[in-house]
Regions:
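Charged phosphate-binding loop/patch that engages nucleotide di/tri-phosphates or the phosphate backbone
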Residues: 112-149
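Conserved catalytic cores of phosphodiester-cleaving nucleases, focusing on short active-site segments
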Residues: 38-40, 45-57
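Short, conserved beta-strand edge motifs with alternating hydrophobic and charged residues
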Residues: 27, 48-51, 89
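Nucleic-acid nuclease catalytic cores
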Residues: 77-104
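Acidic-basic catalytic patches of nuclease active cores, encompassing PD-(D/E)XK
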Residues: 1-29
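Short, electropositive alpha-helical surface patch
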Residues: 98-120
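Mg2+/Mn2+-dependent nuclease catalytic core
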Residues: 55-75
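Active-site metal-binding core of divalent-cation-utilizing nuclease and nuclease-like domains
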Residues: 22-43
């Protein structure tokens, strides 16, 4: 049985974290819909991440919005309002978009989306920067401030 592209994407990011990586637990419980795909924790904090993979994101004229269910949006928004670290990480053919601060529900113009993509290595480093202390990486995260188009 072949794996889904999303599963391959998650595993690539985990490999790019190297030997020093946060504890992570893949979550998949059909009885509690809406909970993100992976929970991370380490000396620097906790992070909940919903992963999506859309190879066509950013191509054409269609605005980009992660394909989240209403339950996922509600769960993510609820935890964000509680002050927890939550993110949606969308992989595509051109790179990776990291959505934080509730912006997972805001459509992005394709040109804005592609201008703010990071590499898979940068996404892996971003996760480490949110969950581990003193790991020697200089990643501050990547959050587009405002959409201009």
């Amino acid at each position: 049985m072949s794996r889904k592209p999303e599963t391959d994407f998650i595993q690539r990011l985990h490999r790019k974290m190297g030997a020093v990586k946060p504890y992570h637990m893949k979550l998949n419980n059909p009885l509690t819909a809406g909970i993100p795909d992976v929970y991370y924790s380490g000396s620097g904090g906790e992070l909940w991440v919903e992963y999506k993979y859309d190879p066509k994101a950013g191509f054409g004229k269609k605005f980009v919005l992660p394909a989240l269910s209403p339950l996922q949006v509600a769960w993510m928004n609820g935890r964000y309002k509680e002050g927890r670290q939550v993110a949606v990480i969308l992989g595509c053919m051109q790179g990776v978009m990291i959505y934080t601060h509730g912006k997972w529900a805001v459509p992005m113009a394709p040109s804005f989306f592609t201008q703010h993509l990071v590499s898979e290595q940068e996404a892996a480093d971003w996760i480490k920067s949110r969950t581990l202390k003193d790991v020697g990486i200089g990643v501050t995260g990547h959050e587009p401030a405002a959409q201009t188009d």
